[in-house]
Amino acid sequence: MTIEKKLEDLGLVLPDPKPPLGAYVPYIERDGLVFISGQGPVLAGGGAICGRLGDGLDIEDGARAAQLSALNILAQIRAAVGSDWQKLVRIVRLCGYVNATPDFTHHPAVVNGASELFVDLFGERGRHTRSAVGVASLPMDWVVEIDAIVEIS
C-alpha cells in the first residue's frame, strides 16, 4: 500500500512542500541522511494552527498541530526521494518545539501527534529518537514546529 493510500485511509492528504520562511533551504541530503528544516502546522489551503498551549489550546490541539507538521515533513521527504518512498530507510530523529505557557508540561504528548503518524505509516522504520521542548514563541505564532533527520538509500 502506498503512503498516499495509507494517509487517505487515515483521512489525511499529503500536502505540497512548503517554501522556506527565510534564508535557508527546506532540506539538505548528505551521506544518506536528509536534514529537514523545521516544519510548522501549515494547512494545505493556507493558514496554520496558531497559538499557545495552556492559553486556550489543549493537548489535543497541539497533537493535531504536530500531526500537520509531520505531514509537512513528509512533503519534504517526498521531494528529497523524488516520490520513491522505497528510498526511505527510516525516520531517525525529530525535535519538536511546542509554543506553550510556562506552566504547560505535556510537551511529549503534543509531539506524539507527529511520532504516532510516522509509526502508523512506516511501522518500525517510523520509530525514531526525539526531543520535545517547550518554548515561549515560534515563527508565525505556530503551536508546534518540528525538524527531522531521516535516512535514505
Identify the meaning behind each predicted range.
Residues 1-153:
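Short, polar/acidic, helix-capping and beta-turn segments at strand->helix junctions
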